[in-house]
Amino acid sequence: MSEEALGELSGYIKERLGDAIEEAKLAYGELTLSVPAASIISVLTFLRDDVQCQFVNLTDISGVDYPQRAKRFDVVYQLMSPRQNQRIRVKVQADEDTLVPSAVPVFVGAEWFERETYDMYGVLFSGHPDLRRILTDYGFEGHPLRKDFPLTGFVEVRYNDELKRVVYEPVQLRQEFRNFDFLSPWEGTDYVLPGDEKAKAN
């Protein structure tokens, strides 16, 4: 879709929804709307039902973690309008305590997307019919896609053939932890990385 058509759509949505749209941004041929959490249901309903929009497909809901922000999470809704041949992205900011209204009443397919976002990031959705983990184990501690989640996790899960059940154990690293220097992609490290001995010698 052309930038001009997206610009017209952005203007139309802002005119119709007013203060429910905090920001409408066009970048890289895509339109992104930033919306307060309290307005997400009315905005999604409008985008689905309005004749000029007809975004009837919710293709994904995902999370993004920005730990340096007060509202550290973005909940991102990806919508598609087959009739208009358009896509749009809607973003809501939340923190660990902010309840984001569930989109299930508007898009029934949102149920598992929201469960995944809860499981991976810990974002809470109010009014969700079954908000529980979907990808991790029931006893899993933490939310693995948060930036502050340890790379190794908290526990190791494996099947114990002697006990004939899954067991949880403290993490045991099979190799020594390696600290790679990624501060500058343009400058090399001061030390020789494993496997680079020949390259550094030349």
UniProtKB/Swiss-Prot annotation:
EC number: 7.1.1.-
Keyword rRNA-binding: no
Single annotated GO MF: NADH:ubiquinone reductase (non-electrogenic) activity
Enzyme kind, highest EC tier: translocase
Compartments where located: Cell inner membrane
Keywords (A to Z) from UniProt: Cell inner membrane, Cell membrane, Membrane, NAD, Quinone, Translocase, Transport, Ubiquinone
PROSITE patterns linked to this entry: COMPLEX1_30K
Top-level division of the source organism's lineage: Bacteria
Recorded topology in the membrane: Peripheral membrane protein
GO cellular component annotations of the record: plasma membrane
Reaction(s) the record says it catalyses: a quinone + NADH + 5 H(+)(in) = a quinol + NAD(+) + 4 H(+)(out)
Major subcellular location class: membrane
Keyword flag Iron-sulfur: no
SUPFAM superfamilies: Nqo5-like (SSF143243)
Family: Belongs to the complex I 30 kDa subunit family.
Biological function: NDH-1 shuttles electrons from NADH, via FMN and iron-sulfur (Fe-S) centers, to quinones in the respiratory chain. The immediate electron acceptor for the enzyme in this species is believed to be ubiquinone. Couples the redox reaction to proton translocation (for every two electrons transferred, four hydrogen ions are translocated across the cytoplasmic membrane), and thus conserves the redox energy in a proton gradient.
Subunit structure of this chain's protein: NDH-1 is composed of 14 different subunits. Subunits NuoB, C, D, E, F, and G constitute the peripheral sector of the complex.
NCBIfam families in alphabetical order: NuoC_fam, PRK06074.1-1, PRK06074.1-5
Protein name: NADH-quinone oxidoreductase subunit C
Gene name per UniProt: nuoC
